[in-house]
């Protein structure tokens, strides 16, 4: 069988170590601001290869292209979806489409039924976070803390995103 033929190349120690390295990288993002953290997580997933012919891990660039052109939200790429920076600055931009206000309303409920990497719900969650943080910024004239931001992301994950 094919499995027996390839089993000799499987080294459990390498597999375990690779998993440990990935977890360490992901944990190193914990102290970043949420928008930057989302971008770093997406970059990490970009290092993964499609595991087989039937499974396609949609790249972050494609997730941004599809969602920003349909529902709008927080786009992490330039207008051509080629770069995440422009003149040394993040290309992060809020995009409005015909349905953006309907999709990204405060009480919206987003159900992701086919999540493999979680990049689609990550895009939506970071967009909702961005909106709510901007509202908090306006309401408090810029006076809010990391604790306030933590509460926003927890609210988004609890009230708006379902996987």
Residues of each region from the PLM?
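Class I S-adenosyl-L-methionine
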Residues: 1-163
